Amino acid sequence: MSATDATQVISATTTTVKRFKGALIGCGFFSRNHLHAWRDIDGAEIVALCDADSERLRAAGQAFGIERLYRDAAAMLSAEQLDFVDIATTAPSHRSLVELAAQAGVAAICQKPFALTLADARAMVAACERAGVPLMVHENFRWQPAIQAVGRALRDGAIGTPFWGRVSFRSAFDVFSGQPYLARNERFIVEDLGIHILDIARFLFGDVTRLAAATSRVNSAIAGEDVATILLTHESGVTSVVDCSYASRQARELFPQTLVEVDGAEGTLRLSADYRLEIHNRDGTRTATAAPPPLAWASVPWEAIQASVVNIQRHWIACLRNGGEPQTSGRDNLKTLALVEATYLSAREGRTVELKSLEAEAPAVTSTSSGAVRR
């Protein structure tokens, strides 16, 4: 071996893979899943935390061994050398925080719902595009192993061309004890949960041209709607039904499982309880289990959701590394957020809503950039 060859071998074996450094903003209920997931992902490290609540901030830092703690996001962005921020706060703070990150030239992940209005969401997308930094919405439900398995089967043509589908989430699980603010929200199930299920419908069947929706409130102790049924017409020709309920008291609680039915020109697909995936076509019927993998930190009944957090955050790091656009980029998520707005409009006015009617650019709402955040 020549000296040149030896040098090339040494260089190849000592090459290190870039480790992306991030900070998490918002140390509340769901952020622990983010932090656990970051630990499981090669090439990523959370080096700082930020939260307006000093006690919660300190507890998260101690639990995950993170020493650099901030109560002000602007101060953190100024002091730290970051590749990205993971914004795990509630929606009212999203625009100011995303704009802060864009001004600092830092890529951003933003929890869902992306924004309270389409105008704010468009402003965030524009800010990041002007700054040339990636923006991804943490729309994790489509990244559940079972939903990914359904998507692969449809792409592989297992049942031919789909023409009808249903995506269903029905439960009576107490989501309010961990997130009490949900009981006070005037817009509840569509904005908090339905946004996930609508995004799954987009993931499986493509973009939507029009929808009609009905909502109701069964639980008188909460402010918002807890039942929604939405009929969607997709550009692909598929007609789908999205139905969501937190008022369905079943013999067996399936939270947080999402069930899927799809009829195609050559067969049917069913994702039923316990992640049982059944595909029937001309070759017969086959079944498989699409259960989430065991994670050391996972907790019952959240395993599938927690697995989806790992998957979407791993996808984010891959996009940062190769320069690709995230599946649920800010610009892509405008389409999911538009479905939420169209659902509320349809339910309120009792009519079918054409999605094109929401595509016109709305004037951006003025927002101040406050660094104090809370989840």
From Swiss-Prot:
<feature type="binding site">
    <location>
        <position position="246"/>
    </location>
    <ligand>
        <name>substrate</name>
    </ligand>
</feature>
<dbReference type="Pfam" id="PF01408">
    <property type="entry name" value="GFO_IDH_MocA"/>
</dbReference>
<feature type="binding site">
    <location>
        <begin position="29"/>
        <end position="30"/>
    </location>
    <ligand>
        <name>NAD(+)</name>
    </ligand>
</feature>
<dbReference type="GO" id="GO:0016491">
    <property type="term" value="F:oxidoreductase activity"/>
</dbReference>
<feature type="binding site">
    <location>
        <position position="41"/>
    </location>
    <ligand>
        <name>Mg(2+)</name>
    </ligand>
</feature>
<feature type="binding site">
    <location>
        <position position="196"/>
    </location>
    <ligand>
        <name>substrate</name>
    </ligand>
</feature>
<protein>
    <recommendedName>
        <fullName>D-apiose dehydrogenase</fullName>
        <ecNumber>1.1.1.420</ecNumber>
    </recommendedName>
</protein>
<comment type="similarity">
    <text>Belongs to the Gfo/Idh/MocA family.</text>
</comment>
<keyword id="KW-0479">Metal-binding</keyword>
<keyword id="KW-0547">Nucleotide-binding</keyword>
<dbReference type="InterPro" id="IPR055170">
    <property type="entry name" value="GFO_IDH_MocA-like_dom"/>
</dbReference>
<feature type="binding site">
    <location>
        <begin position="111"/>
        <end position="112"/>
    </location>
    <ligand>
        <name>NAD(+)</name>
    </ligand>
</feature>
<feature type="binding site">
    <location>
        <position position="51"/>
    </location>
    <ligand>
        <name>NAD(+)</name>
    </ligand>
</feature>
<feature type="binding site">
    <location>
        <position position="93"/>
    </location>
    <ligand>
        <name>NAD(+)</name>
    </ligand>
</feature>
<dbReference type="GO" id="GO:0046872">
    <property type="term" value="F:metal ion binding"/>
</dbReference>
<comment type="function">
    <text>Involved in catabolism of D-apiose. Catalyzes oxidation of D-apiose to D-apionolactone.</text>
</comment>
<dbReference type="Pfam" id="PF22725">
    <property type="entry name" value="GFO_IDH_MocA_C3"/>
</dbReference>
<feature type="binding site">
    <location>
        <position position="38"/>
    </location>
    <ligand>
        <name>Mg(2+)</name>
    </ligand>
</feature>
<feature type="binding site">
    <location>
        <position position="192"/>
    </location>
    <ligand>
        <name>substrate</name>
    </ligand>
</feature>
<dbReference type="GO" id="GO:0000166">
    <property type="term" value="F:nucleotide binding"/>
</dbReference>
<keyword id="KW-0560">Oxidoreductase</keyword>
<dbReference type="InterPro" id="IPR000683">
    <property type="entry name" value="Gfo/Idh/MocA-like_OxRdtase_N"/>
</dbReference>
<dbReference type="InterPro" id="IPR036291">
    <property type="entry name" value="NAD(P)-bd_dom_sf"/>
</dbReference>
<keyword id="KW-0460">Magnesium</keyword>
<feature type="binding site">
    <location>
        <position position="179"/>
    </location>
    <ligand>
        <name>substrate</name>
    </ligand>
</feature>
<feature type="binding site">
    <location>
        <position position="39"/>
    </location>
    <ligand>
        <name>Mg(2+)</name>
    </ligand>
</feature>
<feature type="binding site">
    <location>
        <begin position="179"/>
        <end position="181"/>
    </location>
    <ligand>
        <name>NAD(+)</name>
    </ligand>
</feature>
<dbReference type="InterPro" id="IPR051317">
    <property type="entry name" value="Gfo/Idh/MocA_oxidoreduct"/>
</dbReference>
<keyword id="KW-0520">NAD</keyword>
<feature type="binding site">
    <location>
        <position position="44"/>
    </location>
    <ligand>
        <name>Mg(2+)</name>
    </ligand>
</feature>
<feature type="binding site">
    <location>
        <position position="112"/>
    </location>
    <ligand>
        <name>substrate</name>
    </ligand>
</feature>
<feature type="binding site">
    <location>
        <position position="140"/>
    </location>
    <ligand>
        <name>NAD(+)</name>
    </ligand>
</feature>
<keyword id="KW-0119">Carbohydrate metabolism</keyword>
<comment type="pathway">
    <text>Carbohydrate metabolism.</text>
</comment>
